[in-house]
Amino acid sequence: MKKAILSVSNKTGIVEFAKALTQLNYELYSTGGTKRILDEANVPVRSVSDLTHFPEIMDGRVKTLHPAVHGGILADRNKPQHLNELSEQHIDLIDMVVVNLYPFQQTVANPDVTMDEAIENIDIGGPTMLRAAAKNYKHVTTIVHPADYHEVLTRLRNDSLDESYRQSLMIKVFEHTAEYDEAIVRFFKGDKETLRYGENPQQSAYFVRTSNAKHTIAGAKQLHGKQLSYNNIKDADATLALVKKFDTPAAVAVKHMNPCGVGIGDTIEQAFQHAYEADSQSIFGGIVALNRAVTPELAEQLHSIFLEVIIAPKFTDEALDILKQKKNVRLLEIDMTIDSNEEEFVSVSGGYLVQDKDNYVVPKEEMKVVTEVAPTDEQWEAMLLGWKVVPSVKSNAIILSNNKQTVGIGAGQMNRVGAAKIALERAIEINDHVALVSDGFFPMGDTVELAAQHGIKAIIQPGGSIKDQDSIDMANKHGIAMVVTGTRHFKH
């Protein structure tokens, strides 16, 4: 029987994963809180102490730091000497290590964190097990991200958990532990940047870089301009997150954490022109992100309007010469790599909330046409564009889009009809090719009726209301094509 050690701080999916492992004939060993959760779920699991024959001591500081654990992980199965030594010492082989670390980054992100709290959240045993298992990836499967549970189980079931895949998991482990160590170094070095002020002049603020992630705002290379302000950083982060969703050339403009214009095109110049035309008034003083290099032609377009920050993966030398004529504009060069395992957290009174970032995009084949009329190809393109954008808009959110740009955005309203009114009234165009996109379901048919009054012929929304049929009936009454996705995208 194969053996697996499970010790996780992020309990997402661990019960289901552990149950599946037992069905695949794995014997499970665990520690502390992870074992308690598995015990409560009636998952067969033994204590790591049953391997080490040594109790957890020092409030759990020493649990897995033992030859019985690390010998079983590090043994080279192809070396008889290693196997003989294990046998002599009565040590069992460990075939899988599932570990994620104490939440150091989240802990120190709290501005009121104490030194003792920070120190207690420095994981020792976890990184040691991860690094040992990753080193021996030819024989041991190492999982650090819950997002990998599903594929590991699939590969175990179809016997495709090969060395190449285990190596890919190994790389994730060393990336994770490197970022973890970097966060510790940054915290104790006091790596924080004092900002002029916070959201308003009466608020003090500073920027703490908690990891060495080169594809984030924290790791951006500033090529020109004044120091980034608190609001610049927040807006730039929102802009970057949205532009990364696009594979085709794309441009995103953001004001006050909401996109005001999003455009795509065959070239990055076309994409920016579409984003600019989407709302040429609101883009003034905004943040713009582009997912292609800034060319001289594009630089001339950008230079012609007032922007606070311009973000791109690269600026040509000539483009920089043009843009640097404005001494205050901030130019940020950023790796546009997407990290599917990113988390986000927000402080609340007495604590903070942590969640995975809302990066999920429903595949078109999983969306469902619920009306008598089906969308045209152009309407589908408009819907899919808008569906990428709407998670970045404050709820309640309604977007109008065609197949190349947003044409109207209603953000942050207390009711869905109000958001729709704003989007429809501000729309630069409405025709049969424009789609209305909603981040949440319609509680009744009034939003669809309002859309029909303005000539909308295609709607995409999550569905899920007990009165879904009212909206569907209203769409059918007006010959509107409606698609439901089954996934909402609230943003608070």
UniProtKB/Swiss-Prot annotation:
CDD domains: IMPCH
One Pfam match: AICARFT_IMPCHas
Alphabetized UniProt keyword annotations: Hydrolase, Multifunctional enzyme, Purine biosynthesis, Transferase
Protein name: Bifunctional purine biosynthesis protein PurH
NCBIfam families, per database record: PRK00881.1, purH
Domain notes: The IMP cyclohydrolase activity resides in the N-terminal region.
Family statement: Belongs to the PurH family.
Alphabetical GO biological process terms: 'de novo' IMP biosynthetic process
This protein's pathway: Purine metabolism; IMP biosynthesis via de novo pathway; 5-formamido-1-(5-phospho-D-ribosyl)imidazole-4-carboxamide from 5-amino-1-(5-phospho-D-ribosyl)imidazole-4-carboxamide (10-formyl THF route): step 1/1; Purine metabolism; IMP biosynthesis via de novo pathway; IMP from 5-formamido-1-(5-phospho-D-ribosyl)imidazole-4-carboxamide: step 1/1
